[in-house]
Curated annotation (Swiss-Prot):
Cofactor note: Binds 1 Mg(2+) ion per subunit.
Gene3D superfamilies linked to this entry: 1.10.132.30, 1.10.150.390, 1.10.1790.20, 1.10.40.90, 2.40.40.20, 2.40.50.100, RNA polymerase II, clamp domain, RNA polymerase Rpb1, domain 3
Keyword Ion transport part of the UniProt annotation: no
UniProt name for this protein: DNA-directed RNA polymerase subunit beta'
Any GO BP annotation: DNA-templated transcription
EC code: 2.7.7.6
Length: 1382
């Protein structure tokens, strides 16, 4: 009887476990877990559809096909539960056991597991020290392996071919044992003594002379240690029996028409069973060795195909010619188990529909079609109907809902109240792609979306669809409301600025109402209060844009009311402002930028609730006035500037002039091309400038009849100026000149399109345009995929970066200063330190007062104080220097950008960082085609103009004065500063080698004066001394060729690569006596010419100091688009070595040149103390340092990009992090995308997690082992506690893919990439996954250990002490107090 009651029990909770282990299964384990051996390849009986006995679907082994019913039908129903039928041997239990019961196949001969054989590096091969090629020969019966050498002196594991084996037999006459196939390998593996072997290998490793030998030994040792420590036995890599998957997981489904659909696995198992049975029979019949060998080989191949089809040889195909899906394929790739079913599942209680705009919604609402709501909230409705007594059973409730009776709608209204729903728009690129709203029931079938959240979803209403999800449990509803509600996501997690900002029409409306119109109705009137303005406006006495004066009191402070110059519209706008926001914030023309600023100020001063109310009011007022303004554009609004023809004529003449110079041979073709492009780029800019000036100014008559220029109300200009739609770039194409276009390859076509869209394009111009436009479309498709993949890799590497503690107590941090480029500050120090935590006390440089105490968050007010004090550098805490073992501490991270306060524990900052970097990647990729491929190339900077007046100051510049009296810079990294009277630097510029400086040291400089100029397209080689030119090793056809220009017929000498290692083309300068001139005391005036340089002088001519003797052309410029972008970002995060990376010096010292070696040039750097270091630089590369130059560690000795690994090695982690952060930021800055530095730092931290062991000391580590930094530190602590010698290691920089694959969690790594490889390695090591990251917990179906799932929050308990009322003096009982578990 009890059994019956138990049957209706609630289903058991899933197992509670804290970690999961993977290891190799032993044959005994497989048999132990199996419920019987599968002996026959039959599946089901095709007439009765009953499973065949002992077959692949056998009910005796795997359980009954129908609940509580045996196969022959003798026992049916629940009362016979647990009985085994004596006729058919089937147990009477529920049929769902067919999903979990395993069978097995006993193999007639052992076979190798293909993962351990073929997954590189081959584990079996590694252990036995046999190459994979030989190992395959043995396993597939083409060669013998020595399993026991006995006294013959043969090495254990030697591989013999058939002939060699016969010879050996004759020689040793059976004094040894050898075999072939997996059985022989198994014998070898069983007889291995791992302890003794690993000792031997350790000794070998210490004695190893060559690097290669050491590495090989280390690899073997690693596999051995893994087997030793995990308790796996090597012979388990060879299978004696194979487990058979439960039949429900490889179903056989009858289709109509008597055919069957089957899982590929059944075919693969059938082949294995057939071959196995055949082999057994052949062995019983004692067939000839050849036949048995062949059958064994076929069995090995069948098992290989079952485990990993296509890994070896050709994949086995099914009847329809496509490869069968093996067990490995079930796990691998996008449609494998991990990514398809475990990381992303389809869910119920969801629906999707097209979205339309809902302008009358509040920010926290969305419009939900009644039909959808009825379906989504069904169970809730049934429940309510029953509660209300409308129905008595669920069935009748169902009928009632189907008929859509009026009561149902009333109930639905009630159910829906206060029950948030989640809206999601694919692709969900960052966390704002899913937000919670309160549903409002609407007619129709489209979801209504609030216009202000479109930016976050990146949604528009041209047919986008969105999905609705319903949070069911109370906890999930609370989280949706508190964390995900659109009103709680006003700030963007990527940069901390508001993301809920009016856009498009709303901006235009507010812009229009805050503009000033000269001489409008009511101009100059003075009002006593804002209310009076409202009355006058309602009465139609004043114009919306009239300039008026109003007496206003400051609501923020108690100052006296003052007269403020303003306009009617701005006073009207003030009505919607919260009191805390000062009027000055809106007393200006409100562009999109200003509106964003307004929302930001409101959030900081008035708080979240007020901001939400303001946002909704802005939306309403914006739409209202946009409608009132009635702005529309006509073709006449695109005013073509009058000066356009003149500019084009001038440019054409200049181009002709350049062409003439080229024809005369004064410049090379490359220079000509670059200059032509420059002229056109500049002309396009000029026309654009004039056009924008025209558009933005109108000329009108004032009351006296005089002409005055006033800001224009041109519709196109207003749209672009307000930031509502369109950009200067697009207007330029409409009314200016289309400009230069790029070829698909990225080069710029040198004939520009001089027409604009208003004038119309000629056929040729149209044709050139199509180039760029098509490239834009093609790029978009490709880049979206690339960007998505980048995001996926970033998320994977950073997913376990979670805020785990409040403060790690580190004393380390980063020094941050303003970012400058070309003397211009691109990012102020304030923007970089906002929301970070100060490392030490920040002191005022003048008074020494503490501006910010140590470990305090630097907020907006403190930033203002720091900037006012004029601090140039600030030390802050950083994720990079955080010492938390797992995760990151809140103090090192700083402010949670989306919330505006210090980050909470449990915040998944890694994923947020990955999304913040990845999301704009996709946006940017999609942004290319809007401009339609117009080449946007800045005219290269060729001169420096002083921005301030002052005195010129040369900072380590070596220069010579040429014949014209200009100073020519002769070294790199010199700087030119402008200082004021007090000697304070106002601006500072780097000057390049070969630049002409037009001022002398200490000379007075006026503002706007040109102080230096240079040629950006070539890199000159200059002579430092006057004399006669002599060539050395400049031999035509060997090291130099005369290149004749087809167009001009003129030739020039170009240095080419030579086969002859001894030839080194150079130019020497001789003095009067014919000797090589000396520069200073010791240096010879000898200049080596790199490959590709053009010689500018003739032999035996006189040159002066500072003259150019040769030029190295720079590449023709390509347009900068985020193509330089996305791949560049990926390259940085993958830590790839650039193609031609520069050799950098590892020490400070003085440069000297040594003798050439192996066709490379030798550069010596000699420090003040110690040995000189030598660097070899390939010939033909331009060496950018000169003899006698001082260089600093980390400086490049030649042209080329930096190699991040070198930076880490030479300059350390902080410099590397700075380099990576700056480089990534530069790519995004080019696109105008803001990302906070800390996100990039978070990713870089994950890339720097590991170290490589250099010296093992007295620890258990292996040399060259790559391990987590904290594991290394722990091992060292252990060794030092015992008084041993610690190990040493060097920092490693891993690319994001590598870092993801080398995480501790094998589940996370396997679900990312290279599944088989990861699982193979993990099972050998017997790895334990302690489920610490997010991904592995999602896969195991648990709550993630972040956010509200953090243990810290899961274990909170309420403590309630109830007052004890004692009526009579009774024996008091103990009160129960629930302790809070921290």
């Amino acid at each position: 009887m009890e059994d019956i009651f138990n049957f209706f029990d609630k289903p058991k909770d899933p197992l509670h476990f804290s970690s999961i282990k993977i290891s190799i299964s032993s044959p005994d384990k497989i048999r132990e877990r199996s419920f019987g051996e599968v002996k026959k390849p039959e599946t089901i009986n095709y007439r009765t559809f009953k499973p065949e006995r002992d077959g692949l679907f056998c009910a005796k082994i795997f359980g009954p096909t129908k609940d509580y019913e045996c196969n022959c039908g003798k026992y049916k129903r629940m009362k016979h539960r647990g009985i085994v039928c004596e006729k058919c041997g089937v147990e009477v239990i529920p049929s769902k056991v067919r999903r979990e019961r395993l069978g097995h196949i006993d193999l007639a001969t052992p076979v190798a597991h293909i993962w351990f054989l073929k997954s590189l590096p081959s584990r079996i091969g590694n252990l036995m020290d046999i190459t994979l090629k030989d190992l395959e020969k043995v396993l597939y019966f083409e060669a013998y392996v020595v399993t026991d050498p006995k006294e013959t002196g043969l090495a254990f594991g030697t591989v013999f071919s058939e002939d060699q084996y016969q010879k050996a037999l004759e020689e040793y006459s059976y004094g040894f044992e050898a075999g072939m196939g997996a059985a022989a390998i198994r014998t070898c593996l069983t007889s291995m003594d791992l302890d003794q072997l690993s000792e031997q290998l350790r000794i070998e490793m210490q004695e190893a002379t060559s690097e290669a030998k050491r590495k090989k030994t280390a690899k073997r040792l690693k596999v051995m240690e893994a087997f030793k420590n995990s308790g796996n036995k090597p012979e388990w890599m060879i299978l004696e029996c194979i487990p058979v998957l439960p039949p429900e997981l490889r179903p056989l489904v009858p289709l109509d028409g008597g055919r069957f659909a089957t899982s590929d696995l059944n075919d693969l198992y059938r082949r294995v069973i057939n071959r196995n049975n055949r082999l057994k029979r052949l062995m019983e019949l004692q067939a000839p060795e050849v036949i048995i060998r062949n059958e064994k080989r076929m069995l090995q191949e069948a098992v290989d195909a079952l485990f990993d089809n296509g890994r070896r040889g050709r994949a086995i195909a099914g009847p329809n010619k496509r490869p069968l899906k093996s067990l490995s394929d079930m796990l691998k790739g996008k449609s494998g188990r991990f990514r398809q079913n475990l990381l992303g599942k389809r869910v119920d209680y969801s629906g999707r529909s097209v979205i339309v705009v809902g302008p009358e919604l509040r920010l926290h609402q969305c419009g939900l079609p009644k039909k959808m709501a009825l379906e989504l909230f069904k169970p809730f409705i049934y429940n309510k109907l029953e509660e209300r007594g409308f129905v008595t059973t669920i069935k009748s409730a169902k009928k009632m809902v189907e008929k859509e009776k009026p009561e149902v709608w009333d109930v639905l209204e009630e159910v829906i109240k206060e029950h948030p729903v989640l809206l999601n728009r694919a692709p969900t690129l960052h966390r704002l792609g899913i937000q919670a709203f309160e549903p409002v029931l609407i007619e129709g079938k489209a979801i209504q979306l609030h216009p202000l959240v479109c930016t976050a979803f990146n949604a528009d209403f041209d047919g986008d669809q969105m999905a609705v999800h319903l949070p069911l449990s109370v906890e999930s509803q609370v989280e949706a409301r508190v964390l995900m509600m659109s009103t709680n996501n006003i700030l963007s997690p990527a940069h901390g600025k508001p993301i809920i900002v009016p856009s498009q029409d709303m901006v235009l409306g507010i812009y229009y109402m805050t503009r000033e119109k000269h001489f409008a109705l009511g101009e100059g009137k003075i009002f006593a209060s804002a209310d009076e303005v409202n009355i006058a406006w309602d009465a139609g006495e004043i114009h919306l844009q009239a300039r008026i004066k109003v007496r206003m009191k400051n609501l923020v402070s108690d100052e006296k009311p003052t007269l403020i110059e303003t306009t009617t519209g701005r006073v009207l706008l003030r009505d919607i402002l919260p009191d805390a926001v000062p009027y000055a914030t809106i007393n200006k023309v409100m562009t999109k930028k200003e509106l964003s600023n307004l929302v930001d100020v409101c959030y900081r001063l008035a708080g979240n609730k007020e901001t939400v109310i303001l946002a909704d009011k802005l939306k309403a007022i914006g739409f209202r006035y946009a409608a009132k303004a009635g702005i529309s554009i006509s073709i006449n609004d695109m005013v073509i500037p009058e000066g356009k023809p003149a500019i084009i004529t001038r440019a054409t003449e200049e181009v002709q002039e350049i062409q003439n110079q080229y024809t005369e041979g004064l410049i090379t073709d490359g220079e000509r091309y670059n200059k032509v492009i420059d002229i056109w780029a500049k002309s396009t800019e000029d026309i654009a400038k004039e056009m924008l000036d025209n558009l933005s100014r109108d000329t009108i008559l004032d009351p006296e009849g005089k002409e005055v220029k006033v800001p224009s109300f041109n519709a196109i200009h207003m749209m672009a100026d307000s930031g509502a739609r369109g950009s200067a770039q697009q207007i330029r194409q409409l009314a200016g000149m289309r400009g230069l276009m790029a070829k698909p390859s990225g080069e710029i076509i040198e004939t520009p399109i001089t027409a604009n869209f208003r004038e119309g394009l000629t056929v040729l111009q149209y044709f050139i345009s199509t180039h760029g436009a098509r490239k834009g479309l093609a790029d978009t498709a490709l880049k979206t995929a690339n960007s998505g993949y980048l995001t996926r890799r970033l998320v994977d590497v950073a997913q376990d970066a979670i805020i785990t503690e409040a403060d790690c107590g580190t004393i380390d941090g980063l020094t941050v200063s303003s970012l400058t480029e070309g003397g211009e500050v691109i990012e102020h120090i304030g923007d970089r330190i906002l929301g970070r935590v100060a490392l030490d006390d920040i002191l005022d440089p003048v008074t020494g007062d503490v501006l910010v105490p140590a470990n305090e968050e630097i907020d907006e007010n403190l930033v203002a104080r720091i900037e006012a004090a004029g601090l140039e550098k600030v030390k802050i805490r950083s994720v990079l220097t955080c010492e938390s073992r797992r995760g990151i501490c809140a103090k090192c991270y700083g402010r949670d950008l989306a919330r505006g306060h210090l980050v909470n524990r449990g915040e998944a900052v890694g994923v947020i960082a990955a999304q913040s970097i990845g999301e704009p990647g996709t946006q940017l990729t999609m942004r290319t085609f809007h401009i339609g491929g117009t080449a946007s190339r800045r005219a290269e900077q060729t001169a420096l103009e002083a921005r301030n007046e002052g005195f010129a100051k040369f900072i380590n510049i070596n220069y010579v004065t040429n014949s014209e009296g200009h100073h020519i810079v002769m070294n790199r990294n010199g700087e030119l500063a402008i200082v004021d009277e007090t000697g304070r630097e106002r601006e500072k510029y780097g000057v390049v080698y070969g630049a002409k400086i037009k001022v002398s040291p200490q000379e007075k400089v006026t503002q706007g004066q040109s102080v230096a100029e240079w040629d950006p397209y070539t890199m000159p080689i200059l002579t430092e001394i006057a004399g006669r030119v002599k060539f050395g090793d400049v031999i035509e056809g060997v090291t130099m060729e005369e290149q004749v220009d087809e167009v001009t017929g003129l030739s020039r000498k170009v240095i080419i690569e030579t086969r002859d290692a001894d030839k080194r083309p150079r130019i020497t300068i001789k003095d009067e006596s014919g000797k090589t001139a000396k520069i200073g005391d010791s240096l010879l005036a000898r200049y080596y010419l790199p490959v590709g340089s053009n010689i500018n002088v003739l032999e035996d001519t006189e040159v002066n100091a500072g003259d150019v003797i040769a030029k190295i052309p720079r590449e023709t410029t390509k347009t900068k688009d985020i193509t330089g972008g996305l791949p560049r970002v990926a390259e940085l995060f993958e830590a790839r070595k650039p193609k031609d990376f520069a050799v950098i010096t590892e020490i400070d010292g003085v440069v000297a040149f040594g003798k050439d070696a192996k066709g490379k040039r030798k550069v010596l750097v000699t420090p003040e103390l110690g040995e000189p270091k030598e660097y070899l630089i390939p010939k033909g590369k331009h060496i950018s340092v000169h003899e006698g130059d001082h260089v600093r560690a980390g400086e490049a000795l030649m042209d080329g990009s930096s190699n991040p690994h070198d930076i880490l090695r030479v300059l350390g982690q902080k410099e590397l992090a700075k380099y990576l952060v700056d480089e990534v930021q530069e790519v995004y800055r080019l696109q105008g995308v803001k990302i906070n530095d800390k996100h990039i730092e978070t990713i870089v931290r994950q890339m720097l997690r590991r170290v490589r062991v250099k010296d093992v000391g007295d620890t258990n580590l292996l040399i060259d082992d790559q391990i987590e930094r904290w594991v290394f530190e722990e091992e060292n602590e252990k060794a030092m506690d015992k008084g041993g010698r610690p190990a040493t290691a060097e920092s490693l920089l891993l690319g994001i893919t590598k870092a993801s694959l080398s995480t501790e969690s094998f589940i996370s790594a396997a679900s990312f990439q290279e599944t088989t490889k990861v699982l193979t390695q993990a099972s050998i090591e017997g790895k334990i996954d302690s489920l610490r990251g997010l991904k592995e917990n999602v896969i195991m179906g648990r709550l993630i250990p972040a956010g509200t799932g953090l243990a810290l929050y899961r274990n909170l308990r309420m403590v309630a002490e109830e007052p004890v009322i004692i009526p009579e003096p009774v024996e008091p009982e103990d009160e129960e107090i629930y302790e809070e578990e921290a």
